[in-house]
Swiss-Prot record:
The lineage of its organism: Bacteria, Bacillati, Mycoplasmatota, Mycoplasmoidales, Mycoplasmoidaceae. It comes from Ureaplasma urealyticum serovar 10 (strain ATCC 33699 / Western). This is Small ribosomal subunit protein bS16. One of its GO terms (molecular function) is structural constituent of ribosome. GO terms for biological process: translation. Belongs to the bacterial ribosomal protein bS16 family. Keywords: Ribonucleoprotein, Ribosomal protein. HAMAP family: Ribosomal_bS16. It comes from the Bacteria.
Length: 101
């Protein structure tokens, strides 16, 4: 059975000082529950984003679904576009292998 995982934000900031971790967690887990892997953090006050690019791409290729907010952050950082390019390249490679057989 395949576990559905999501890439989403968990709030760890204090009152009126939001700060979020970008984490991979089970889709059915609570928003601030236990997570599988920490992929970076986001500070909306300063507009600062720190991401682990390779880990994010690996999780996306394994089928993790980003939340809308995380998808927007990944798009702004150029990671989502890179993931789509990798996905298309893999499709073309598989099609070429299937055609060769």
């Amino acid at each position: 059975m395949k576990i559905l995982v999501k890439i989403r934000l968990t709030r760890v900031g204090t009152h009126k000082k939001p700060f979020f971790r970008i984490v991979v967690m089970d889709a059915k887990a609570k928003a601030n529950g236990a997570y599988i892997e920490n992929l970076g953090h986001y500070d909306p006050v300063l507009g600062k984003v720190v991401l682990k690019k390779e880990a994010i791409l690996a999780q996306l290729q394994n089928g993790a679904q980003p939340s809308e907010t995380v998808k927007n952050i990944l798009s702004q950082e150029g990671i989502w576009k890179e993931f789509i390019a990798l996905k298309d390249a893999n499709k073309k490679r598989k099609a070429a292998l299937a055609k060769a057989k």
